[in-house]
Amino acid sequence: MNAPQNSPEIGREIIAAGIRTNLHDSGAGFPLMMIHGSGPGVTAWANWRLVMPELAKSRRVIAPDMLGFGYSERPADAQYNRDVWVDHAVGVLDALEIEQADLVGNSFGGGIALALAIRHPERVRRLVLMGSAGVSFPITEGLDAVWGYNPSFAEMRRLLDIFAFDRNLVNDELAELRYQASIRPGFHESFAAMFPAPRQRWVDGLASAEAAIRALPHETLVIHGREDQIIPLQTSLTLADWIARAQLHVFGQCGHWTQIEHAARFASLVGDFLAEADAAAIS
């Protein structure tokens, strides 16, 4: 996709599952793949920019723009659904010759990471689900607004207020940046094709079966912001209940942007959780 010159959102390009894929790849060590959410104009860099540098100090961090998002390819005949996105994520691992990785999934990306771990358990060492989809719930007004976004500065400003608990993080400059991202050529067309109304079906389409979730063998860290208006806290309570080897961390005074509103704590929490597996592999 066409990108602003010298944009930090551009990493390197690989072909994954036949899709030209924009990818950020930094650090060394056991690989961690980070799967972004589904906000308008989203990119992997926009989602993970505040935590990738810290996590990359101790591991290889891989953050792709998923099919149809950011600066990855948008084929005219693309089908957008959970299984296609799982195939794309597995394609990223295959293209990089990575047999197994830790996964972090944010919101929509959590639903993809969860489904990947269920379908391909041998490809996943540990799992982190943050403000995650993956179980069915009545769609919130916040999520319906996000997926139903019609490009305008005012609409983007309103959405950012829904995303963040801390209103000091939201200003007109940020809203203008995210609005401009959402109207780059091809961005809104593919976004609108993903989640047309009625949108409850897309919540359900990202959900995995309870029995499959209960059968997950992976150590899993479930993270949520208590004041999240996009994905209800109850989804993470359910995931923590169903996943046998789960632990749950709830950030107070936090909306849907855990990795932004509590970036240092998020990086430390995730880093420590993954370091346990690093230590076990050495001992």
Curated annotation (Swiss-Prot):
InterPro entries: AB_hydrolase_1, AB_hydrolase_fold, AB_hydrolase_sf, Epox_hydrolase-like
GO cellular component: membrane
Coiled coil: none
GO BP, sorted A to Z: benzoate catabolic process via hydroxylation
Keywords, in A-Z order: Aromatic hydrocarbons catabolism, Hydrolase, Plasmid, Serine esterase
Keyword flag Lipid metabolism: no
Pathway the protein contributes to: Aromatic compound metabolism; benzoate degradation via hydroxylation
UniProt EC number: 3.7.1.9
Known catalytic reactions: (2Z,4E)-2-hydroxy-6-oxohexa-2,4-dienoate + H2O = 2-oxopent-4-enoate + formate + H(+)
Stored SUPFAM superfamilies: alpha/beta-Hydrolases
Domain AB hydrolase-1: 32-262
GO molecular function annotation: 2-hydroxymuconate-semialdehyde hydrolase activity; carboxylic ester hydrolase activity
Pfam families, per database record: Abhydrolase_1
UniProt function note: Catalyzes the conversion of 2-hydroxymuconate semialdehyde to 2-hydroxypent-2,4-dienoate.
Family under the similarity heading: Belongs to the DmpD/TodF/XylF esterase family.
Protein name as annotated: 2-hydroxymuconate semialdehyde hydrolase
Organism per entry: Pseudomonas sp. (strain CF600)
Gene: dmpD
